[in-house]
């Protein structure tokens, strides 16, 4: 069933990846997304340029690659695939000069996963063809 915060804010379907990131942002950052619905793939807006505000989510959107280095707490967005038409979202739990670690819910693999991080011509690439971008709280 659907998981709601005490004030009625829609966190999403229990145990899904979207519910995890929305619950994390609500409990840890006290952040409510203006648009509370959608699948993971809906969190990335293809019409936005790197670093623009994603109004539906109330967060800055960065592409992969991006001029801005990923940060702990950023939401990573994975594009849909043949086996997963909904896409996937996760949270960056660790960043260093050459890798990021994510934490995630509702995956067959591990709840934590690492990806290489490369800087080429002042652009930060998270090495995965599945990662289309990320969302970040405005500073």
Where on the chain are the PLM-derived regions?
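N-terminal capping segments
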Residues: 1-48
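Generic intrinsically disordered, low-complexity segments enriched for polar/acidic and small residues
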Residues: 17, 21-25, 40-41, 59, ...
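General structural signal for secondary-structure boundaries
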Residues: 39, 66, 114-116
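...with weaker cross-activation on analogous glycine-rich loops/strands in unrelated enzymes
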Residues: 41-107
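Aromatic- and glycine-rich peptidoglycan recognition patches
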Residues: 82-139
């Amino acid at each position: 069933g659907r998981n709601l915060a005490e004030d009625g804010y829609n966190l999403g379907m229990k145990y899904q990846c979207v519910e995890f990131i929305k619950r994390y942002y609500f409990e840890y950052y006290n952040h409510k997304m203006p648009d509370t619905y959608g699948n993971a793939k809906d969190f990335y807006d293809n019409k936005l340029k790197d670093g623009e505000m994603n109004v539906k989510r109330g967060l800055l959107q960065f592409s992969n690659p991006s001029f801005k280095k990923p940060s702990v707490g950023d939401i990573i967005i994975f594009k849909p695939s043949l086996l997963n038409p909904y896409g996937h979202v996760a949270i960056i739990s660790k960043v260093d000069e050459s890798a990021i670690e994510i934490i995630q819910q509702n995956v067959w693999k591990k709840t934590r996963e690492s990806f290489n991080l490369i800087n080429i011509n002042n652009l930060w690439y998270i090495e995965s063809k599945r990662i289309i971008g990320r969302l970040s709280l405005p500073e």
